[in-house]
């Protein structure tokens, strides 16, 4: 369910002609129908979260189509015009290079880059935020950028939780417990849920849950008997915090609300919100 302040609401898009209106309405309907509580202080925060999710999906598909290569950290490579490859296989932003330009280059010249799936997910998150921020703001927040697995910038605020309901734009993890040690990079797959039962994972592409599990199962030890599976771990950008940096020139999604209850008591412990 969706909560704005203390009101449980059912939101709907009022302008059906705005970009990705159908996709945004689908996301709103999923969130409103889920048992998980999605709590926002204002309607603008919800609008930011909605546009962020859409841009995460767009960025995932753009990265998929960019020619970006799958490589282990030992084999990783990057465009030396913008990045320096570290000894561990990460990408360190060169001095005096704006992070916005360097992130955009990954999507423009994907064939000049190769790394593993976790780093790819963080790149998608950065690109989605860049779509909603002024470049000056993005460059200030993410100066001295390092792209290396989950070692992301401290100003990128993420929420990771176990349990909850899947929403398009979520980052979820497939685990392969009996992976073949010879191909340890396939011990799991970080993916973006695109909606309509499809996921994007760097290395596996755009596939259904069943297809990703099949792909991981093909990389298990001989005589393996435990299947790969989709875990209940969900990672999201903390839109309540990151929305404060949004560009004032970014068009807001026009949302109206059908009130359901306006006296809810909202309690949050960790990353779990409960309604009384």
Swiss-Prot record:
Domain of life, per lineage: Bacteria
Record's signal peptide: none
Catalytic reactions on record: L-glutaminyl-[protein] + L-lysyl-[protein] = [protein]-L-lysyl-N(6)-5-L-glutamyl-[protein] + NH4(+)
Single Gene Ontology MF annotation: protein-glutamine gamma-glutamyltransferase activity
UniProtKB keywords: Acyltransferase, Sporulation, Transferase
One Pfam family named in its UniProt record: TGL
EC number(s) from the headed UniProt entry: 2.3.2.13
Transferase recorded as keyword: yes
Keyword Transferase: yes
InterPro entries (alphabetical): Gln_gamma-glutamylTfrase_bac
GO annotation (BP), single: sporulation resulting in formation of a cellular spore
Functional description taken from the UniProt entry: Probably plays a role in the assembly of the spore coat proteins by catalyzing epsilon-(gamma-glutamyl)lysine cross-links.
Family per record: Belongs to the bacillus TGase family.
Protein name, as recorded: Protein-glutamine gamma-glutamyltransferase
